[in-house]
């Protein structure tokens, strides 16, 4: 597949429990890994195979070391929050980002999304403008929290899941990209007919779904620095038209 709804079960330890330790032995133990990051168990078939790879143990060891020496974003309980909004079998659209926002209070585990109480970043503002261009009647709250999309089956996934506060791309060499690539590859094999939105060269090089099996949409990155204005992107409309041809419920892109 690659060259590179039901309500999910409530994850363990979400109500103020002491932070569980990271697993260290190889192969990594699924139960310990799940507890450490509050991962929904529905994602086990897609994530657990990565735990047998020694590179994942090395990744977690380096992540743990960074947590001891620098402020890492998002908080550990949000690194895998994308597993808690919908199950793999409910995913309809995959939007690939690069790494989390690096200012405090913004990142919460969903690519491009920010917490509801913080200003909308410029790239996300352009994404929402493109939605409005596709759907002029869409209700937009003025906030940048995309949890509603995630619950509707939009997987908002960064290729790098963590970042040092104030230092963009600072964790890009930890190995998250390999881990995430494996997860997406298994999702694509399990779920033919997904819509992939790949914005910018990074996403398009990192994730390469088979266009014979999936609907692959490419555009420039929504950054204000991109040469092509993202407001002209028609991906949200195109995705829904494709889903409708497969008798799948379209996404309500309102925020």
UniProtKB/Swiss-Prot annotation:
Superkingdom of origin: Viruses
UniProt entry tagged with the keyword Acetylation: no
Active site (record annotation): 99
Secretion signal, residue range per the UniProt entry: none
Major localisation: host cell
Functional description taken from the UniProt entry: Excises uracil residues from the DNA which can arise as a result of misincorporation of dUMP residues by DNA polymerase or deamination of cytosines. Therefore may reduce deleterious uracil incorporation into the viral genome, particularly in terminally differentiated cells which lack DNA repair enzymes.
Protein name listed in UniProt: Uracil-DNA glycosylase
Organism field: Human herpesvirus 2 (strain HG52)
Taxonomy of the source species: Viruses, Duplodnaviria, Heunggongvirae, Peploviricota, Herviviricetes
């Amino acid at each position: 597949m690659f060259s590179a709804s039901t309500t999910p079960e409530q994850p363990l330890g979400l109500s103020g429990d002491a932070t569980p330790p990271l697993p260290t032995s190889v192969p990594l133990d699924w139960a310990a890994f799940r507890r450490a990051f509050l991962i929904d168990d529905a994602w086990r078939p897609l994530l657990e195979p990565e735990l047998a790879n020694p590179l994942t143990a090395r990744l977690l060891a380096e992540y743990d070391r960074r947590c001891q020496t620098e402020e890492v974003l998002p908080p550990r309980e949000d690194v895998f929050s994308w597993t808690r909004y919908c199950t793999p079998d409910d995913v309809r659209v995959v939007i690939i980002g690069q790494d989390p926002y690096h200012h405090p209070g913004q990142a919460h585990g969903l690519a491009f999304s920010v917490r509801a109480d913080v200003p909308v970043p410029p790239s996300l503002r352009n994404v929402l403008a493109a939605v409005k261009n596709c759907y002029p009647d869409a209700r937009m709250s003025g906030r940048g929290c995309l949890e509603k999309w995630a619950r509707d089956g939009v997987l908002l996934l960064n290729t790098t899941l963590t970042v040092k506060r104030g230092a963009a791309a600072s964790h890009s060499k930890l190995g998250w990209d390999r881990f995430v690539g494996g997860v997406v590859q298994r999702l694509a094999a399990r779920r033919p007919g997904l819509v992939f939105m790949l914005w910018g060269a990074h996403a398009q090089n990192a994730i390469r779904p088979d266009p014979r099996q999936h609907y692959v949409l490419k555009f420039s990155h929504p950054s204000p620095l991109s040469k092509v204005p993202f407001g002209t992107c028609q991906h949200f409309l195109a995705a829904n038209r494709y889903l409708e041809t497969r008798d799948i419920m379209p996404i309500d892109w309102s925020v």
